[in-house]
Amino acid sequence: MSSGGLLLLLGLLTLWGVLTPVSSKDRPKKPGLCPPRPQKPCVKECKNDWSCSGQQKCCNYGCIDECRDPIFVN
């Protein structure tokens, strides 16, 4: 293969790697911990941290999955 062909192949592979969307299961979890369980009926508000806005985390409390602001401990 010529050097031009190799450069084209490398460029296409790089572009594919940049444009391929990263699924939420491959992303690291957001920092912090979930606060204590709220006292409310079952609700499924989120599936993972990345379905929550900003710094909020998707916190699972049994039958409750909801976006909550994280708490940080030292």
UniProtKB/Swiss-Prot annotation:
Disulphide bridges, residue numbers: 34-59, 42-63, 46-58, 52-67
Keyword Secreted assigned: yes
Cellular localisation: Secreted
GO CC annotations, alphabetized: extracellular region; extracellular space
One GO biological process term: venom-mediated disruption of cell wall in another organism
Signal peptide: 1-24
Keyword Phosphoprotein assigned: no
This protein's UniProt keywords: Antibiotic, Antimicrobial, Disulfide bond, Secreted, Signal
Domain of life from the UniProt record: Eukaryota
Domain WAP residues, every copy: 27-71
Tissue specificity as recorded in UniProt: Expressed by the venom gland.
An example molecular function term from Gene Ontology annotations: serine-type endopeptidase inhibitor activity
Protein family: Belongs to the venom waprin family.
Function as written in the Swiss-Prot or TrEMBL entry: Damages membranes of susceptible bacteria. Has no hemolytic activity. Not toxic to mice. Does not inhibit the proteinases elastase and cathepsin G.
Identification of the protein by name: Auswaprin-a
Native organism: Pseudechis australis (Mulga snake)
